[in-house]
Design a protein with these regions (language model features):
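Elongated alpha-helical scaffolds
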Residues: 81-95
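Short loop/turn elements at secondary-structure junctions
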Residues: 4-6, 27-31, 93-161
Length: 161
């Protein structure tokens, strides 16, 4: 079942699949801070999609030139299920682990700083892979993704004659 509900891209259970002890360091899965981090993770993924992927998508899909500058991405049409792994990496690397670190000098980084760096690196790799594979965007809002609703970053369909 695809996630088009507008809910967060990940929940605590998704995080523990990748980092089983994540919520054992002082910030619990149900804390307000964690809830805010989930929302920030989702918002950052949508923002990055709007910046990197949406301009390519709308140029390739919309043939009416008058629509190009006015078409906005509809968040509830993006299948968030494909961003689970990227969402976990972003949550851990940008929000959760930095909240736990003491930010020591470069030579004395603590466990959380090192983990945050690792997860941000993994996020960048996963993000690129998703964009290259194709973002699932339910253009007609029918709840299913067909082949022409999966657009890679480079818009390979432009070369089709």
């Amino acid at each position: 079942m695809a996630n088009y509900t507008g809910a967060n891209v990940i929940v605590a259970g998704d995080v523990t699949k990748y980092q089983p002890d994540a919520f054992g360091f002082g910030i619990a899965s149900g804390d307000t801070e964690t809830t805010n981090f989930f929302a920030q993770t989702t918002n950052d993924i949508f923002r990055q999609l709007r910046v990197e992927w949406w301009p390519v998508y709308k140029t390739n899909i919309f043939t009416d030139i008058t629509v190009l500058n006015t078409a906005e991405m509809v968040n509830t049409k993006v299948n968030l299920d494909q961003f689970e792994r990227a969402g976990v990496y972003l949550f851990l690397g940008r929000f959760f682990l930095p909240a736990l670190t003491k930010f020591r000098p470069e030579t004395q980084k603590d466990r959380f700083e090192r983990m945050a760096e690792y997860y941000m690196g993994q996020y960048n790799i996963e993000w690129r892979m998703i964009l290259e594979d194709g973002v699932e965007y339910d253009t007609d809002a029918d709840g299913t993704i067909v082949s022409n609703e999966r657009e890679p970053l480079h818009g390979f369909r432009r070369l089709t004659r």
